[in-house]
């Protein structure tokens, strides 16, 4: 059998031709003289059909019956080389199918644990290394790949340079209570929560920079939106205003959605994602509302029949129900800007004339997906930043390099970060973030 293989995703290019593919058997059915194989090769799924009379005619009765019997008894996830003629077939959900003419078993698969029946989440997570082979999980990872590709493409086109921040650090970028600590040759070190502080150094050297890599948060959270290890894209830029930053963030998110539509259309179809709704998010401008305006809206509607959130006063932080209501109220991704300084990071620049608010923004995704981007303008004044650190009782010695950026040619600058898994969950329309990463790390899960 020829081993010049064709990928399933390229099969439509070979209508009327005999081809060979390498694939796994996702499922099979049939009876009597016909057998149907559901095949996958990592690029897509499609169907092959084997007719017993055709095998007898081609190979003779003894060998033909033997090959057809092999097909009928293939077990789930057996790997095979399969040869056949590609034929258009309107009855097939793929629009075409493979008329199988030969088969060769590569690797047997006996007792595959994930069968077509329903399984519980814990069982599927324990077998995550195998669950990834399912149609839905493959589709989610294809969307993840499309979003990562679109990230690199967007920043390259917008003049950004990839800048690699360290994963081990001696300081915290955000909340020090959420750090994973390790020993670094006798000195305490921490797994990175964010590359932001180092990216600011990159922005002072290169103007526009971004990084992309794993970050770690020791959050004891069991929600559907939290992981302890996830992949973060952080971007930093010099000489950009707050409004220009929001414009950039909006363009970036729209590019990610478009990237998934362009590069993973079959995956979106498998997941039954409403692509017209995604296109609406691209076509319409994102809403921008201040934190205080959002609080006023929440208070005005808190007694409506369809609301389900707790009362908030000005100065309170949002919970997930509040974020969901805000984004659903506007129906498109919504920037909430200028939060209280009291619960935001030390490095955020105050709103001119209103030191109780900072120049920041969270982008809230509709459909209940909540925050997907957090960003701010950074405090670029040395004395103001030192005063803020002293107010919070921070150890300046851990941040000398960061303060130096304000001593030697400081400029207005800002940045934002996006957790790729949250974006994947939103674009894919899935319910839980654990499916947006190949091997999720959560409060009570570090295997497989």
UniProtKB/Swiss-Prot annotation:
A cellular component annotation (GO) from this entry: cytoplasm
InterPro entries: Aa-tRNA-synt_II, aa-tRNA-synth_II, aa-tRNA-synth_II/BPL/LPL, Asn-tRNA-ligase, Asp/Asn-tRNA-synth_IIb, NA-bd_OB-fold, NA-bd_OB_tRNA
GO MF terms held by the record: asparagine-tRNA ligase activity; ATP binding; catalytic activity, acting on a protein; nucleic acid binding; transferase activity
Compartment list: Cytoplasm
EC numbers, comma separated: 6.1.1.22
N-terminal signal peptide: none
Any Pfam family: tRNA-synt_2
Entry keywords, A to Z: Aminoacyl-tRNA synthetase, ATP-binding, Cytoplasm, Ligase, Nucleotide-binding, Protein biosynthesis
Main location as per UniProt: cytoplasm
Catalytic activity: tRNA(Asn) + L-asparagine + ATP = L-asparaginyl-tRNA(Asn) + AMP + diphosphate + H(+)
GO BP: any one term: asparaginyl-tRNA aminoacylation
Disulfide feature: none
HAMAP family for the chain: Asn_tRNA_synth
Cross-referenced PANTHER family: ASPARAGINE--TRNA LIGASE, MITOCHONDRIAL-RELATED, ASPARTYL/LYSYL-TRNA SYNTHETASE
Oligomer status and interactors: Homodimer.
Family: Belongs to the class-II aminoacyl-tRNA synthetase family.
Name of this protein: Asparagine--tRNA ligase
